[in-house]
Amino acid sequence: MKTRFQFGLFALALLMAGCGGNKGGEPVADRPIIQMDSIDYPDLPDGATIRMSKSDFPKGKIRSIEQIPIEGLEITNREIDHLMVKDYLIIKHLEFRKGANLVHVVSLPDYRLVAEMAPFGEGPDEFHDVRLIPTEESDKLCYVLNCADGRLCYLSNDLRLVPCGHRVAPGRGPNVNLFVGKDLLLTEHDSSEGKGLIAVNQRDSTVTGLLPLHFSENVGGYFYLVSFAHSYQKRRVAISFLFHDRIGFFDFDGGHPKFIRFGDKTLKTLASPENPMYYHNCFANDHYVFAVYRPSNYNTEKDRETFLEQYDWDGNLVARYELPKDRGFYSGYATNESDTEIYLVDYYEDQFLHRVTLERP
Protein backbone atom coordinates (compact mmCIF):
# COMPACT_ATOMS: atom_id res chain seq x y z
CA MET A 1 0.00 0.00 0.00
CA LYS A 2 1.25 3.42 -0.82
CA THR A 3 0.85 6.17 1.67
CA ARG A 4 0.30 9.38 -0.08
CA PHE A 5 -0.55 10.91 1.55
CA GLN A 6 1.14 16.61 -0.38
CA PHE A 7 2.61 32.62 -4.63
CA GLY A 8 3.84 35.49 -3.80
CA LEU A 9 2.87 36.67 -0.33
CA PHE A 10 0.74 39.43 -1.80
CA ALA A 11 -1.27 36.96 -3.87
CA LEU A 12 -1.69 34.78 -0.82
CA ALA A 13 -2.88 37.70 1.25
CA LEU A 14 -5.54 38.45 -1.35
CA LEU A 15 -6.54 34.80 -1.53
CA MET A 16 -6.82 34.41 2.21
CA ALA A 17 -8.62 37.67 2.94
CA GLY A 18 -11.71 37.02 4.99
CA CYS A 19 -11.05 33.32 5.64
CA GLY A 20 -11.80 32.04 9.09
CA GLY A 21 -10.01 29.45 11.14
CA ASN A 22 -8.44 28.44 14.32
CA LYS A 23 -6.51 28.54 15.39
CA GLY A 24 -3.38 27.81 17.20
CA GLY A 25 -0.06 29.47 16.59
CA GLU A 26 0.48 32.86 14.99
CA PRO A 27 -0.09 34.42 11.56
CA VAL A 28 2.74 33.97 9.05
CA ALA A 29 4.04 37.54 9.21
CA ASP A 30 4.79 37.34 12.95
CA ARG A 31 7.10 34.31 12.80
CA PRO A 32 10.91 34.10 12.47
CA ILE A 33 12.33 32.75 9.22
CA ILE A 34 14.42 29.60 8.85
CA GLN A 35 15.94 28.22 5.65
CA MET A 36 15.96 24.69 4.23
CA ASP A 37 17.43 23.91 0.83
CA SER A 38 17.54 27.63 -0.11
CA ILE A 39 13.83 28.14 0.62
CA ASP A 40 12.76 30.48 3.43
CA TYR A 41 10.02 29.23 5.77
CA PRO A 42 8.25 30.95 8.66
CA ASP A 43 9.27 28.80 11.63
CA LEU A 44 6.66 27.17 13.83
CA PRO A 45 5.81 29.58 16.63
CA ASP A 46 6.23 28.75 20.30
CA GLY A 47 3.26 26.79 21.53
CA ALA A 48 2.26 25.53 18.07
CA THR A 49 3.04 21.93 19.09
CA ILE A 50 1.18 20.46 22.04
CA ARG A 51 1.60 17.08 23.72
CA MET A 52 -1.46 14.89 24.21
CA SER A 53 -2.31 11.26 24.94
CA LYS A 54 -4.58 8.89 23.07
CA SER A 55 -6.52 8.54 26.32
CA ASP A 56 -7.55 12.19 25.94
CA PHE A 57 -9.91 11.19 23.11
CA PRO A 58 -13.58 10.69 23.95
CA LYS A 59 -14.50 7.13 22.95
CA GLY A 60 -16.88 6.71 20.04
CA LYS A 61 -18.49 3.59 18.60
CA ILE A 62 -18.83 2.05 15.14
CA ARG A 63 -22.55 1.45 14.72
CA SER A 64 -22.39 -0.34 11.37
CA ILE A 65 -20.14 -1.20 8.41
CA GLU A 66 -21.87 -1.76 5.07
CA GLN A 67 -20.08 -3.00 1.95
CA ILE A 68 -20.92 -1.05 -1.23
CA PRO A 69 -20.51 -2.92 -4.53
CA ILE A 70 -19.45 -0.80 -7.51
CA GLU A 71 -21.16 -1.87 -10.72
CA GLY A 72 -18.75 -2.50 -13.59
CA LEU A 73 -15.51 -2.11 -11.62
CA GLU A 74 -13.14 -4.96 -10.82
CA ILE A 75 -9.86 -4.18 -9.08
CA THR A 76 -7.29 -6.92 -8.50
CA ASN A 77 -4.53 -4.75 -7.03
CA ARG A 78 -4.99 -2.67 -3.91
CA GLU A 79 -2.73 0.25 -4.87
CA ILE A 80 -5.71 2.59 -4.74
CA ASP A 81 -5.99 6.36 -4.61
CA HIS A 82 -9.37 8.07 -4.64
CA LEU A 83 -11.01 11.47 -4.68
CA MET A 84 -14.66 12.32 -4.10
CA VAL A 85 -15.77 15.44 -5.98
CA LYS A 86 -19.25 16.67 -6.89
CA ASP A 87 -21.31 13.62 -7.91
CA TYR A 88 -18.36 11.35 -8.64
CA LEU A 89 -15.88 9.09 -6.91
CA ILE A 90 -12.63 9.12 -8.91
CA ILE A 91 -10.40 6.08 -8.36
CA LYS A 92 -6.82 5.55 -9.50
CA HIS A 93 -5.06 2.22 -9.27
CA LEU A 94 -2.28 0.20 -10.82
CA GLU A 95 -3.85 -2.41 -13.08
CA PHE A 96 -1.50 -5.37 -13.51
CA ARG A 97 -3.65 -6.97 -16.20
CA LYS A 98 -3.33 -3.94 -18.47
CA GLY A 99 0.14 -2.92 -17.32
CA ALA A 100 -0.65 0.67 -16.45
CA ASN A 101 -2.29 3.04 -14.01
CA LEU A 102 -5.97 3.55 -14.74
CA VAL A 103 -8.37 6.26 -13.62
CA HIS A 104 -11.99 5.21 -13.10
CA VAL A 105 -14.97 7.52 -12.59
CA VAL A 106 -17.85 6.17 -10.51
CA SER A 107 -21.17 8.02 -10.36
CA LEU A 108 -22.77 8.75 -7.01
CA PRO A 109 -25.05 7.79 -5.39
CA ASP A 110 -25.68 4.74 -7.61
CA TYR A 111 -22.01 3.56 -7.50
CA ARG A 112 -21.81 2.76 -11.20
CA LEU A 113 -18.69 2.94 -13.37
CA VAL A 114 -19.27 5.65 -15.98
CA ALA A 115 -15.79 6.32 -17.41
CA GLU A 116 -12.28 4.92 -17.53
CA MET A 117 -9.18 6.96 -18.38
CA ALA A 118 -6.19 4.93 -19.55
CA PRO A 119 -3.44 4.17 -19.80
CA PHE A 120 -0.64 5.97 -18.01
CA GLY A 121 2.50 3.93 -18.74
CA GLU A 122 3.26 1.35 -21.39
CA GLY A 123 3.67 -1.77 -19.23
CA PRO A 124 4.47 -4.44 -18.37
CA ASP A 125 7.59 -2.93 -16.78
CA GLU A 126 6.79 0.78 -16.97
CA PHE A 127 4.07 1.88 -14.60
CA HIS A 128 3.75 5.66 -14.66
CA ASP A 129 2.39 6.76 -11.34
CA VAL A 130 -0.35 9.35 -11.58
CA ARG A 131 -1.69 11.67 -8.94
CA LEU A 132 -5.26 12.91 -8.49
CA ILE A 133 -5.08 16.58 -7.52
CA PRO A 134 -8.20 18.35 -6.20
CA THR A 135 -9.13 21.83 -7.39
CA GLU A 136 -11.78 24.41 -6.57
CA GLU A 137 -12.11 25.45 -10.23
CA SER A 138 -15.75 24.84 -11.11
CA ASP A 139 -15.09 23.78 -14.73
CA LYS A 140 -12.91 20.83 -13.65
CA LEU A 141 -13.38 17.75 -11.51
CA CYS A 142 -9.68 17.40 -10.71
CA TYR A 143 -6.20 17.47 -12.17
CA VAL A 144 -4.32 14.29 -13.10
CA LEU A 145 -0.54 14.49 -12.92
CA ASN A 146 1.76 12.00 -14.65
CA CYS A 147 4.56 11.84 -12.09
CA ALA A 148 7.07 10.36 -14.56
CA ASP A 149 7.20 13.32 -16.94
CA GLY A 150 5.35 16.14 -15.16
CA ARG A 151 2.57 16.31 -17.74
CA LEU A 152 -0.65 17.64 -16.35
CA CYS A 153 -4.21 16.97 -17.49
CA TYR A 154 -7.53 17.90 -16.05
CA LEU A 155 -10.69 15.85 -15.87
CA SER A 156 -13.54 17.93 -17.26
CA ASN A 157 -17.12 17.95 -16.04
CA ASP A 158 -18.10 15.94 -19.12
CA LEU A 159 -15.54 13.27 -18.14
CA ARG A 160 -12.82 14.05 -20.70
CA LEU A 161 -9.12 14.02 -19.89
CA VAL A 162 -7.75 17.29 -21.30
CA PRO A 163 -3.97 17.97 -21.57
CA CYS A 164 -2.84 21.26 -20.07
CA GLY A 165 0.94 21.20 -20.30
CA HIS A 166 3.52 20.78 -17.58
CA ARG A 167 3.12 21.66 -13.95
CA VAL A 168 5.53 24.16 -12.46
CA ALA A 169 7.30 22.70 -9.42
CA PRO A 170 10.74 22.69 -7.82
CA GLY A 171 13.25 20.07 -8.89
CA ARG A 172 13.11 17.85 -5.83
CA GLY A 173 10.26 15.44 -6.24
CA PRO A 174 7.20 16.79 -4.48
CA ASN A 175 4.69 14.00 -4.05
CA VAL A 176 1.66 15.55 -2.40
CA ASN A 177 -0.23 18.21 -4.34
CA LEU A 178 -3.20 20.49 -3.81
CA PHE A 179 -4.40 23.16 -6.23
CA VAL A 180 -5.77 26.11 -4.32
CA GLY A 181 -6.96 27.92 -7.40
CA LYS A 182 -6.26 28.25 -11.09
CA ASP A 183 -2.61 29.25 -10.68
CA LEU A 184 -1.72 28.24 -7.14
CA LEU A 185 -0.39 24.85 -6.03
CA LEU A 186 0.33 23.68 -2.51
CA THR A 187 2.86 20.86 -2.44
CA GLU A 188 5.84 19.54 -0.50
CA HIS A 189 9.58 19.84 -1.04
CA ASP A 190 12.12 17.36 0.29
CA SER A 191 15.53 18.40 1.57
CA SER A 192 18.32 16.85 3.61
CA GLU A 193 17.16 18.87 6.63
CA GLY A 194 13.55 17.78 6.45
CA LYS A 195 10.44 18.50 4.44
CA GLY A 196 8.96 21.86 3.60
CA LEU A 197 5.40 22.64 2.62
CA ILE A 198 5.48 25.20 -0.16
CA ALA A 199 3.22 27.19 -2.48
CA VAL A 200 4.12 27.37 -6.19
CA ASN A 201 2.73 30.04 -8.50
CA GLN A 202 1.94 28.32 -11.80
CA ARG A 203 2.31 31.54 -13.80
CA ASP A 204 5.74 32.77 -12.75
CA SER A 205 7.20 29.77 -10.83
CA THR A 206 7.49 31.78 -7.61
CA VAL A 207 8.06 29.45 -4.64
CA THR A 208 6.94 30.51 -1.17
CA GLY A 209 7.78 28.47 1.92
CA LEU A 210 4.73 27.85 4.11
CA LEU A 211 5.78 25.47 6.89
CA PRO A 212 9.01 23.61 7.76
CA LEU A 213 8.81 20.02 9.00
CA HIS A 214 12.09 19.25 10.72
CA PHE A 215 11.35 18.12 14.25
CA SER A 216 13.80 15.17 14.19
CA GLU A 217 17.49 16.02 13.94
CA ASN A 218 19.45 15.11 10.79
CA VAL A 219 16.44 13.51 9.11
CA GLY A 220 15.68 14.00 5.41
CA GLY A 221 12.32 14.66 3.84
CA TYR A 222 11.45 10.99 3.22
CA PHE A 223 10.89 10.44 6.93
CA TYR A 224 8.23 13.16 6.96
CA LEU A 225 5.84 11.33 4.65
CA VAL A 226 2.40 12.80 5.18
CA SER A 227 -1.19 12.38 4.13
CA PHE A 228 -2.95 15.56 3.11
CA ALA A 229 -6.57 16.63 3.76
CA HIS A 230 -8.17 19.99 3.13
CA SER A 231 -11.31 22.09 3.29
CA TYR A 232 -11.83 24.83 0.72
CA GLN A 233 -14.58 26.27 2.91
CA LYS A 234 -12.36 26.48 6.00
CA ARG A 235 -9.23 27.31 3.94
CA ARG A 236 -7.44 24.81 6.17
CA VAL A 237 -5.12 21.83 5.65
CA ALA A 238 -4.54 18.79 7.86
CA ILE A 239 -1.52 16.51 7.61
CA SER A 240 -0.86 13.20 9.36
CA PHE A 241 2.57 11.57 9.52
CA LEU A 242 3.43 8.00 8.62
CA PHE A 243 6.59 7.73 10.74
CA HIS A 244 5.69 10.19 13.52
CA ASP A 245 2.81 9.90 15.95
CA ARG A 246 1.51 13.40 15.29
CA ILE A 247 -0.99 15.34 13.22
CA GLY A 248 -1.03 19.00 12.15
CA PHE A 249 -3.51 21.70 11.09
CA PHE A 250 -2.83 25.04 9.39
CA ASP A 251 -4.28 27.64 7.01
CA PHE A 252 -3.70 27.53 3.25
CA ASP A 253 -1.04 30.21 3.66
CA GLY A 254 0.69 28.36 6.52
CA GLY A 255 -0.87 30.59 9.17
CA HIS A 256 -2.24 29.51 12.56
CA PRO A 257 -0.47 26.13 12.72
CA LYS A 258 -1.32 23.60 15.41
CA PHE A 259 0.48 20.28 15.76
CA ILE A 260 -0.50 17.52 18.18
CA ARG A 261 2.28 15.15 19.24
CA PHE A 262 1.23 11.88 20.82
CA GLY A 263 4.35 9.72 20.63
CA ASP A 264 8.12 9.96 20.72
CA LYS A 265 9.73 13.04 19.24
CA THR A 266 12.46 11.22 17.30
CA LEU A 267 12.65 8.27 14.94
CA LYS A 268 13.98 4.92 16.09
CA THR A 269 16.52 4.68 13.24
CA LEU A 270 17.15 6.21 9.83
CA ALA A 271 16.14 2.95 8.14
CA SER A 272 12.44 3.23 7.39
CA PRO A 273 11.50 -0.49 7.77
CA GLU A 274 12.71 -0.36 11.37
CA ASN A 275 10.44 2.54 12.28
CA PRO A 276 6.87 1.94 13.35
CA MET A 277 4.20 3.38 11.08
CA TYR A 278 1.39 5.37 12.60
CA TYR A 279 -0.97 7.42 10.44
CA HIS A 280 -1.73 5.80 7.10
CA ASN A 281 -4.19 8.37 5.79
CA CYS A 282 -6.27 11.38 6.70
CA PHE A 283 -9.34 12.78 4.96
CA ALA A 284 -11.94 15.41 5.72
CA ASN A 285 -15.17 17.20 4.99
CA ASP A 286 -15.87 20.84 5.83
CA HIS A 287 -16.66 20.00 9.45
CA TYR A 288 -14.22 17.31 10.59
CA VAL A 289 -10.87 15.68 9.91
CA PHE A 290 -10.55 11.88 10.12
CA ALA A 291 -7.25 9.99 10.43
CA VAL A 292 -6.59 6.24 10.19
CA TYR A 293 -4.19 5.25 12.97
CA ARG A 294 -2.62 1.80 12.71
CA PRO A 295 0.65 1.49 14.68
CA SER A 296 2.74 -1.36 13.28
CA ASN A 297 6.15 -2.19 11.88
CA TYR A 298 4.68 -3.36 8.58
CA ASN A 299 1.48 -2.30 6.90
CA THR A 300 0.66 -5.90 5.93
CA GLU A 301 0.05 -7.01 9.52
CA LYS A 302 -3.64 -7.86 9.44
CA ASP A 303 -4.13 -8.41 13.17
CA ARG A 304 -3.01 -4.96 14.25
CA GLU A 305 -5.36 -2.67 16.11
CA THR A 306 -6.71 0.09 13.90
CA PHE A 307 -8.37 3.28 15.05
CA LEU A 308 -10.22 6.11 13.38
CA GLU A 309 -9.50 9.47 15.00
CA GLN A 310 -11.81 12.46 14.56
CA TYR A 311 -10.84 16.13 14.99
CA ASP A 312 -12.42 19.46 14.25
CA TRP A 313 -10.57 21.93 12.01
CA ASP A 314 -9.13 23.73 15.04
CA GLY A 315 -7.33 20.52 15.99
CA ASN A 316 -9.60 19.67 18.92
CA LEU A 317 -10.12 15.99 19.70
CA VAL A 318 -13.69 14.87 18.90
CA ALA A 319 -13.69 11.06 19.17
CA ARG A 320 -11.67 7.88 18.65
CA TYR A 321 -13.22 4.74 17.19
CA GLU A 322 -11.81 1.21 17.25
CA LEU A 323 -12.01 -0.49 13.83
CA PRO A 324 -12.08 -4.26 13.24
CA LYS A 325 -8.58 -5.77 13.52
CA ASP A 326 -8.85 -8.11 10.53
CA ARG A 327 -9.80 -5.42 8.03
CA GLY A 328 -7.54 -3.37 5.80
CA PHE A 329 -9.07 0.03 6.42
CA TYR A 330 -6.24 2.35 5.40
CA SER A 331 -8.02 5.27 3.73
CA GLY A 332 -11.41 6.81 3.14
CA TYR A 333 -13.42 9.92 2.37
CA ALA A 334 -16.17 11.98 3.97
CA THR A 335 -18.96 14.08 2.50
CA ASN A 336 -20.80 17.11 3.85
CA GLU A 337 -24.12 15.30 3.65
CA SER A 338 -23.67 13.56 6.99
CA ASP A 339 -21.37 13.99 9.98
CA THR A 340 -22.04 10.45 11.20
CA GLU A 341 -21.41 8.54 7.95
CA ILE A 342 -18.02 8.17 6.30
CA TYR A 343 -16.59 5.83 3.66
CA LEU A 344 -13.58 3.57 4.21
CA VAL A 345 -11.52 1.58 1.70
CA ASP A 346 -10.60 -1.99 2.71
CA TYR A 347 -7.38 -2.90 0.93
CA TYR A 348 -7.89 -6.61 1.65
CA GLU A 349 -11.17 -6.97 -0.29
CA ASP A 350 -12.10 -6.88 -3.97
CA GLN A 351 -15.28 -5.00 -3.08
CA PHE A 352 -13.26 -2.40 -1.23
CA LEU A 353 -15.71 0.43 -0.49
CA HIS A 354 -17.65 0.51 2.80
CA ARG A 355 -20.12 2.91 4.38
CA VAL A 356 -19.36 3.32 8.08
CA THR A 357 -21.83 4.80 10.55
CA LEU A 358 -20.30 6.48 13.60
CA GLU A 359 -21.73 7.13 17.04
CA ARG A 360 -20.00 10.03 18.74
CA PRO A 361 -19.77 10.15 22.54
What residue ranges belong to the model's regions?
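A short helix->beta-strand "capping" segment at the edge of beta-propeller domains
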Residues: 46-77
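Conserved blade-ending motifs and adjacent loop-strand segments that build the rim/top face
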Residues: 125, 264-272, 316-337
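Beta-strand-rich domains and repeat architectures in extracellular enzymes and scaffolds
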Residues: 66-101, 290-294
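Beta-propeller blade signature
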Residues: 103-109, 198-201, 304-316, 355-360
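Loop/turn-rich, solvent-exposed surfaces of beta-rich toroidal or solenoidal domains
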Residues: 274-311
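C-terminal motif of bacterial Sec signal peptides marking the signal peptidase cleavage site
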Residues: 16-18
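Blade-loop segments of beta-propeller domains
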Residues: 112-140, 215-219, 327-329
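Structural signature of eukaryotic scaffold interfaces centered on beta-propeller domains
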Residues: 78-85, 130-138, 175-181, 224-234, ...
